[in-house]
Amino acid sequence: MNPSELVREFHRVYDMPVYDSPHRPSSERVKLRVGLILEEFCELLSGVYDNGSKTWTSIYSTTIKNALPPSKDPEGYNEVEVADALADLVYVIYGMALELGIPLDDVLEEVHRSNLSKLGEDGKPIYREDGKVMKGPNFFEPNIRKVLRDHHKPGSF
């Protein structure tokens, strides 16, 4: 499956919104999505600059998350700018993966496999109060190290 199909499957399994034409989401969904992007960006910073120490993730939790605008209709919402920024983010992220030799599509498949293990004991999604999917009792971490090892070429380091 391509990345879009993986995410679509996740949304279907966890009963999250999917629209096939431009749609203005609720302020709560915008805040959740922007927060998730910032949270993952902070994880990237921790991995690049702090050997994965979670320093940036901690900064996100204590500072950046609280700086997001309150849940109200974003008056300045511009779907063209949002679409452009999302495309640019994906483009730049794939570019970074290429420069680092990271097989991003394979890593995404492994993360997707892990994400599908978040269901609760009853087979239903578990949500945080803001709508974020939480890890259930059968959750397992993605084995990204194995994916990278499987793609490692001897002598490349």
Task: Walk through the language-model features, giving the residues of each.
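Flexible "arm" and connector segments at domain edges
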Residues: 1-86, 90-157
